[in-house]
Swiss-Prot record:
<keyword id="KW-0677">Repeat</keyword>
<dbReference type="GO" id="GO:0000056">
    <property type="term" value="P:ribosomal small subunit export from nucleus"/>
</dbReference>
<dbReference type="InterPro" id="IPR016024">
    <property type="entry name" value="ARM-type_fold"/>
</dbReference>
<protein>
    <recommendedName>
        <fullName>Nucleolar protein 9</fullName>
    </recommendedName>
</protein>
<feature type="repeat" description="Pumilio 4">
    <location>
        <begin position="280"/>
        <end position="320"/>
    </location>
</feature>
<keyword id="KW-0539">Nucleus</keyword>
<comment type="function">
    <text>RNA-binding nucleolar protein required for pre-rRNA processing. Involved in production of 18S rRNA and assembly of small ribosomal subunit.</text>
</comment>
<dbReference type="InterPro" id="IPR001313">
    <property type="entry name" value="Pumilio_RNA-bd_rpt"/>
</dbReference>
<feature type="repeat" description="Pumilio 1">
    <location>
        <begin position="86"/>
        <end position="121"/>
    </location>
</feature>
<feature type="repeat" description="Pumilio 7">
    <location>
        <begin position="505"/>
        <end position="542"/>
    </location>
</feature>
<dbReference type="GO" id="GO:0003723">
    <property type="term" value="F:RNA binding"/>
</dbReference>
<dbReference type="GO" id="GO:0005730">
    <property type="term" value="C:nucleolus"/>
</dbReference>
<dbReference type="GO" id="GO:0000480">
    <property type="term" value="P:endonucleolytic cleavage in 5'-ETS of tricistronic rRNA transcript (SSU-rRNA, 5.8S rRNA, LSU-rRNA)"/>
</dbReference>
<feature type="region of interest" description="Disordered">
    <location>
        <begin position="1"/>
        <end position="42"/>
    </location>
</feature>
<dbReference type="InterPro" id="IPR011989">
    <property type="entry name" value="ARM-like"/>
</dbReference>
<dbReference type="InterPro" id="IPR040000">
    <property type="entry name" value="NOP9"/>
</dbReference>
<feature type="repeat" description="Pumilio 6">
    <location>
        <begin position="364"/>
        <end position="401"/>
    </location>
</feature>
Length: 656
């Protein structure tokens, strides 16, 4: 058969090309794939409004709890109880109000166990509706976390003394199971719903006994960046039930298994095996993988499915498992590697997938073009970094061999690549270490450049916030670059030397400004290592730093540098005493500063004033601890030589 060409080839390529749907929330475009109907897509979310007096009362209650100016815990508890009594029968009206929903969250965080169950009961029948509401969904998330903590409490202490109320005998586990049965028919609609998807993610985390992240935590598996910023602005502080793993009963694992089983059946139309699934259903599920709302949910599903599904059904629904390439899968992978949402999806699923699955994707689709993928700064580069972390030694070395020669070029647009390659090299027994160091020096400290300065090339000092008088906060980019330079300093002593050389080339005022900078001061701290820096360079650094040691001691960032100087001046007693005397001369200023007090204590200056011999003993002990094999500068008992030893032999006899 002849090689396909012309129109036939173009048609085949167009047929295999992966093009996700532009809209994911329109039922007509999804047919019956997502199982949505009019009720699921637009559930009832209006439950009435409060009258003016009620609204004013609850606004005042929210403000009171926000200020938290109660005299004692008992007074606050009584206030919470009174407000909860006032909310009876009005809970649904409150949770759909922007201000009153914050009140409900505060009440849920501060209420007791029985009050928590009563709030759960008030939401019976409308849990799905609330999960789809902008404000009520946040209330529901807080309620679910507190409920998970109560489930754990009842699991560990099954009997409670003094419980006579009939409601007290209803366990939180049963309350939870009732709620889960209520939302189960709506799971597919929740996956790509703007608000309900967050509730679904939280439910999966709870059922799988995973860590429940804080509502303001960075890189959270639960909330979006926009949601975390809004959470910080309303100033509702999480309690101890967040940011931890809760023990759950066996019934929760069974519920999770049932959740995912029903979802899989819906996504595959009940197909018995992977080969029986219609390509249309596979394509539509892949479209959900690149949907900004649904993608994080599917990532979490793939992460937890291995708890009870050894076949990894959802992974196999997204990717094939054969050893041969597939045109449609190849097109899908190419889309993932060039799309921001898709690359984030692939990066995350790689991190918790079986190694053999990741190796297959790498060998079939990514290995031949790994350098090109690394050059896709906002997409494929992150996937390549994930491969370096999770592939086996052989594949990691292959990637390093391809990327290390290009490292200086890759760092132009993605400084994180340097971190990934350094860590991969260390993990592989310092594989290609010398070449990595040379590439980094070519990039940041080239020999042919007479004005080379790693602080400028790496930290971009001239365009930074260093020295600004407007109290500008250090930027995220400055923080990222500073951390990278700190990693280089710890990676090899060559970077310690070039960093110190660069610091000494700066004007003294500019160098001292680094000591007061919220980010760059950490770079200064990292080079103050007495065992790595030779005595001459230590003295050169100290000559500059000693000039402003008092002001540095009273600064939030500079005080850490002065603390470091205590060890950095080991075996340099004159410099140590010079710093101690400088602090002593302005002792009032130092002691009146909270940062200066710590410096005073860390430098043992009370002993220096009252018992100078004890202070010198501490200094000598430190010298021995840091330089145990150091030879004294002069022998304790030098041999006495006669004065005439330097005379010529002919004149020695006459000298006595």
């Amino acid at each position: 058969m002849g090689k396909p060409r012309g129109r036939k080839l173009l048609k085949q390529q167009e047929k295999d090309q992966f093009k996700p749907a532009k809209e994911f929330d329109v039922p007509d475009e999804q047919d019956n794939f997502d199982g949505s109907n009019g009720t699921d897509s637009d559930p009832q979310m209006f439950f009435g409004v409060l009258d003016r007096e009620e609204l004013e009362y609850f606004k005042h209650a929210e403000a009171t709890l926000s200020m938290d100016a109660f005299d004692n815990a008992e007074e606050k508890k009584q206030f919470v109880t009174n407000v909860i009594e006032e909310t009876r029968g009005k809970e649904l009206k409150l949770v759909i109000s922007q201000i009153c929903s914050k009140l409900m969250e505060r009440l849920i965080l501060d209420c007791d166990d029985q009050q928590l169950k009563s709030i759960f009961k008030a939401f019976n029948g409308v849990f799905y509706n609330l999960s789809c509401h902008k404000y009520a969904s946040h209330v529901l998330e807080t309620l679910l976390v507190r409920g998970a903590a109560l489930v754990e409490k009842e699991l560990l202490t099954p009997s409670f003394d003094g419980e006579t109320d009939e409601e007290s005998f209803i366990t939180m586990e049963n309350v939870y199971l009732y709620m889960l049965n209520e939302v189960k028919p709506h799971l597919k609609a929740m996956i790509n719903h703007r608000y309900a998807s967050h509730v679904l993610r939280l439910l999966i985390l709870i059922l799988a006994s995973k860590n429940l992240p804080k509502t303001t935590q960075n890189n959270s598996t639960l909330r979006s960046k926009k949601s975390k910023i809004a959470r910080k602005m309303i100033d509702i502080k999480d309690n101890d039930d967040f940011d931890r793993v809760h023990q759950t009963p066996e019934s929760f694992k069974l519920e999770l298994k049932d959740f995912l089983k029903n979802l899989y059946a819906g996504f595959t139309n009940g197909a018995a095996s992977r080969s029986d699934i219609s390509p249309t259903y596979v394509t539509k599920f892949r479209e959900l993988c690149v949907d900004p709302v649904a993608s994080p949910v599917i990532q979490l599903i793939i992460q937890v499915e291995g708890i009870f599904d050894r076949e990894r059904s959802f992974w196999r629904l997204v990717f094939n498992t054969t050893d041969e390439t597939d045109a449609k899968e190849e097109a899908f992978l190419e889309y993932l590697l060039s799309d921001p949402v898709g690359s984030h999806f692939l990066e995350n699923v790689i991190s918790f997938a079986r190694t053999k699955f990741v190796e297959r994707l790498y060998n079939l689709y990514m290995k031949p073009k790994i350098t090109k993928l690394a050059q896709r700064d906002t997409t494929g580069a992150f996937v390549v970094q994930a491969l370096l972390r999770h592939l086996k030694d052989k594949e990691v070395k292959e990637i390093l061999e391809e990327l290390v020669p290009q490292l200086s070029m890759l760092l132009n647009s993605n400084i994180d690549f340097g971190t990934s390659i350094i860590e991969a090299s260390i993990k592989e027994d310092n594989y290609l270490r010398d070449e990595v160091i040379n590439q980094l020096l070519v990039k940041y400290y080239p020999e042919q450049n007479e004005n080379r300065n790693i602080l400028e090339s790496c930290l971009l000092l001239s365009s930074s916030t260093l020295g600004n008088t407007r109290d500008d906060w250090p930027t995220a980019e400055e923080r990222r670059r500073s951390l990278f330079l700190e990693q280089l300093i710890g990676y090899d002593s060559k970077f310690v030397d070039v960093t110190i050389e660069s610091m000494l080339k700066l004007p003294e005022e500019r160098f001292l400004q680094m000591a007061y900078h919220g980010v760059f001061s950490h770079v200064v701290e990292h080079v103050l290592k007495p065992t790595i820096v030779d005595a001459i360079k230590r003295k050169l650094l100290l000559n500059v730093l000693c000039k402003d040691v008092v002001n540095m001691s009273c600064n939030a960032y500079g005080s850490h540098i002065v603390d470091k100087l205590w060890e950095f001046t080991a075996k340099l007693t004159l410099y140590k005493e010079r710093i101690a005397n400088s602090l002593l001369k302005e002792s009032d200023k130092v002691k009146n500063s909270s940062y200066g007090k710590r410096v005073w204590r860390n430098w043992h200056l009370d002993q220096y004033v009252r018992k100078p011999m004890d202070w010198r003993r501490i200094v000598k002990e430190q010298d021995v601890a840091i330089f145990p094999n150091a030879q004294p500068l002069q022998p304790k008992n030098p041999l006495k030589r006669p004065k005439h030893t330097d005379l010529p032999p002919s004149k020695r006899k006459g000298v006595k």
